[in-house]
From Swiss-Prot:
One Pfam family named in its UniProt record: SDH_alpha
Molecular function terms, GO-annotated: L-cysteine desulfhydrase activity
Organism in which the protein naturally occurs: Nitratidesulfovibrio vulgaris (strain DSM 19637 / Miyazaki F)
A single BP term in Gene Ontology: L-cysteine catabolic process to pyruvate
The protein's name: UPF0597 protein DvMF_1488
InterPro entries: Ser_deHydtase-like_asu, UPF0597
Family according to the record: Belongs to the UPF0597 family.
Amino acid sequence: MDIAAFFAAEVKPALGCTEPGAVALAAATAARHLPAPPERIHLRLSANIYKNGQSVGIPGAQGLRGNMLASALGALAGDADMGLQALAAVTADDVAAARALTERGAVTQEIVQDVPTVYAEAELYRPGHLVVAVVAGRHDRVAEVRHNGQVVYRAEDALGGDSLPPYMADLQRAAFGDLWNWADGIDADLARDLLRGAEMNLAVAEQGLANPWGLAVGHTLGMALRGGDCRNDSASDARAPGSCVPDACGPDISARVKATTAAAADVRMAGANQPVMSSAGSGNHGLTAIIPPALAARAWGRSDAELARALALSHLVTGAVKARTGRLTPLCGCAVAAGAGAAAALVRLADGTPAQAEQAVALVFSSVMGMICDGAKGGCALKVGTAAAEAWSAAQLALHGPGMTGAEGIVSPDFRASLRSLGEVSSLGFAAVDVAIIRLLERGVQ
């Protein structure tokens, strides 16, 4: 497998939720071909892009939410060269202008069928100009741009729809031992990048532990664990790095892993203007895949090299699960995919064997397989925290328990067999669930 290609495409910084990020990128790309700001914007979105962008905070948008606002910001102030960080430089004036555009009804959206699960089409209009930009296949992949009906750009790579790039096809076929061995083979440059991702995500967790972002899941749980308030009420109150992260050596490590990982999701879902390292196209996947092993490495005194290999395994397991279940699915990938990756990484850091790590993955599947995705929002911090805690529990069971010796329901001790089950459940069994969730989101839950 092309390890470098996998990590270059699948593990990268992302600002805010990646679904409205893809929408903002499409709008920013289209806006490049207009001589002045658009008068109208129309979005055509896959059901999953619609679902995951409907209720989530937009970075730098002062608490405002949704795909339509993301598209307006992208069109008025986005930088397409920044990919999933297209909104990194938006200002308060930009937010006011974008809000005005949406409030006067100039931004509309619709769900379209028979498109890839990752599909965001932004149509921008002003007199004499109609520009359409399409992001498809991956959140940061601009597939096509049309200006007044003429194609001015079309992606040259072979990716189309939901087809898999070669490295993901390799992951789909891989045995668990292959993932373990590939993680062994990372070079020094990749190891540094993986460690940088851990630093990024722990820094975001620090913010969530110190301040009550969103539902304040991590902040509240962290306060309870510390027996006091870690809130930073003053912008000038500089705290030492790590001062708000609960001590991972304490008596209830699972609770500390849960609080810290949830805290990072609190910050991200609230729309903080701070990037995280993503995994498999999702920032929350990245938080779940990275933070539990990073905390464990700190607690157990593991070397940077050991942590880097564990993180590589976590991302590879996450990617392998997503290769089977799909990029965006009715299942919560933070739990099923990234939780499995984190569990495998924790076993590796504890000097466990590949067989024990494979057991841990199966135990995560058995625990959280039924968790649904009802769109990105503040409540994702609850699911991310649960996934992190279950990853810890699964690792402990795999290291110290008897393990699974045969199938438990539709989960097998064999990694590939379980992935086949997950793929079928996701694509067939949960298809109606997605339809129902989107109908409820369109109608509005009171």
